[in-house]
Amino acid sequence: MPHNSIRSGHGGLNQLGGAFVNGRPLPEVVRQRIVDLAHQGVRPCDISRQLRVSHGCVSKILGSRYYETGSIRPGVIGGSKPKVATPKVVEKIGDYKRQNPTMFAWEIRDRLLAEGVCDNDTVPSVSSTNRIIRTKVQQPFNLPMDSCVATKSLSPGHTLIPSSAVTPPESPQSDSLGSTYSINGLLGIAQPGSDKRKMDDSDQDSCRLSIDSQSSSSGPRKHLRTDAFSQHHLEPLECPFERQHYPEAYASPSHTKGEQGLYPLPLLNSTLDDGKATLTPSNTPLGRNLSTHQTYPVVADPHSPFAIKQETPEVSSSSSTPSSLSSSAFLDLQQVGSGVPAGASVPPFNAFPHAASVYGQFTGQALLSGREMVGPTLPGYPPHIPTSGQGSYASSAIAGMVAGSEYSGNAYGHTPYSSYSEAWRFPNSSLLSSPYYYSSTSRPSAPPTTATAFDHL
């Protein structure tokens, strides 16, 4: 760079002592020298010190210019980049892409350089090549056929045939749902004024649907309109979906009325009276041995409902343990429905006439389940013995709760241990004579505590 140019421009010296001019690129000689030193293997920091050029300038020339584009010429300052997508380059890119549709953009770029169509300064980048292929070589198919540029540049062996199976969209005036591109048209929502029109044209829509189904095999198939079904046709189609998949979950009113007709109240009352007559009281005393199963009367017909009126049982003894009950059926009902006091009358369950076999009726199955609940013990649980606060059972009563072969009712004959001797704890005499065994008599006295030790000082 001449010396007078430095004085004429707004120049100066950088941190390394090199001259520069504001707003002007680095001279071509310095740029070429930077590239030559880089080819020799000199590091960018050493190039910066030798040529007295800032490190940022060296990195930009090598990285952003030479290594990417292969050129060391400076870019245009104060203007846009020169256009690389010239008509000649676009035509060549189109020819390469038609000859080899799977050709990559970087391969097209290398071929442009190899054939001399572009040089290192005018060759388009990979992104520019992809943009040219996307916008100018491959045209979208929804454009008119006469104005499509791709059809003009196609080879004679490649032609585009329009599909006759695609029906053009109907005009907004003929669509009862409104404009196709409106919100109502896209969502399929009918306009307020179209309900009356659909009711008037229901016959025409049904005829149109039948004609379309008949002519679908001969002519081009038309799209099925969303308003082809009238309300008269939609009601029988929606009936199966309105039914409950689980009919027992919710009982309909008609189903309830039918069951009320099957079980009238006078018939239920007469059935309850017959059920009372079949119950015979039993005076069988309840034994103390609960391990043996008790026998209970079972109703012969499990489906005949009945109500039970139980009198107050007579207690034979004044102890807290009842020894006998007037009826064995009272035991069953007392266990199942423990909230009913003695002497109370169980009313007939006329409030639920349609669910006689499910709710509120005592049947033979209920008695059987009550007998299982009255068994000696529940599975996995020992017999209940009340605490001292609740009362106590005699030893004979506790022994009667289990089988006699398993436990003895007699008390233990030996006397309890008042003190535990070493002979009882260690029956083997060799353990007592072991050097590792220290008896309580041979143990030394405890060492004096800290307080005691300080007292002796």
Curated annotation (Swiss-Prot):
Upper taxonomic lineage: Eukaryota, Metazoa, Chordata, Craniata, Vertebrata
Annotated signal sequence range: none
GO MF, any single term: DNA-binding transcription factor activity
Main location: nucleus
GO cellular component, one term: nucleus
This protein's name: Paired box protein Pax-8
Origin species: Pongo abelii
Ranges where the record places region Disordered: 160-223
Region annotation (PAI subdomain) ranges: 12-69
Stored InterPro entries: Homeodomain-like_sf, PAIRED_DNA-bd_dom, Paired_dom, Pax2_C, PAX_fam, WH-like_DNA-bd_sf
Pfam families per the UniProt record, alphabetical: PAX, Pax2_C
General function of this protein: Thought to encode a transcription factor. It may have a role in kidney cell differentiation. May play a regulatory role in mammalian development.
Region entry RED subdomain, spans: 88-136
Subcellular location(s) of the protein: Nucleus
Residues carrying Phosphoserine: 304
Gene: PAX8
GO biological process, one term: cell differentiation
SUPFAM superfamilies the record matches: Homeodomain-like
Chain residues forming the annotated DNA-binding region: 9-136
PROSITE patterns named in the record: PAIRED_1 (PS00034), PAIRED_2 (PS51057)
